[in-house]
Amino acid sequence: MLIQNASWIRMKDAVSTVVPVFKRTFGTSQPVKTATLEVTCDGVYEAVLNGKRVGEFILAPGWTEYSKRLQVQCYDITALLAGGDTHNEKKAKNTLEITVGNGWFRRTNAPWTKTNNPDEFLPAMLIAALHIIYEDGSEEVIPTDARWQVAESTITLSGIFITSRFCPWQNCDSEHPCSAATAEVFKEKIRC
């Protein structure tokens, strides 16, 4: 699994209810043979590549015994990727956005939280790796790291056992992110 070489990333000062969107723009300079995305998080996620949803899994990565394991999904994203054109000097641009909402792990009053404040959640964290194999046999891995951007989404509260709140007037989207910043690499060891 290539995800083992990626870093957990999060929004700086992220103890809040706002749902973050992690974003990575990258190019492909030649035709792509296959591409896969390995991803998991400490909440629930939805991945979108070039404006199209990745996979059909709702509430991914699903529930698990968090003190022992996290589930990792692997998606074939070849058809969603903008491949390079060998007759054109420009790289094909791709944008991957992963929204991480609160799930079973990131919920209020969970035994592993350090607060009883219902407005505070553990920071949303993400780990992922894109694996691209080009037609010439060369490979590229794009892991989660400090090159990713993170912004607040228009979702101000989400949860499995609570309602969701949206603030559409914030007008945040991939073209106009709210408080975009570089993702912070989480340095502490995660026990899986």
PLM regions and their residue ranges:
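Residue-level detector of intrinsically disordered, flexible termini
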Residues: 5, 34, 91, 179-182
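Accessory beta-strand-rich segments of carbohydrate-active enzymes
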Residues: 11-17, 21-168
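Boundary/junction segments of secreted and surface-exposed precursor proteins
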Residues: 1-13
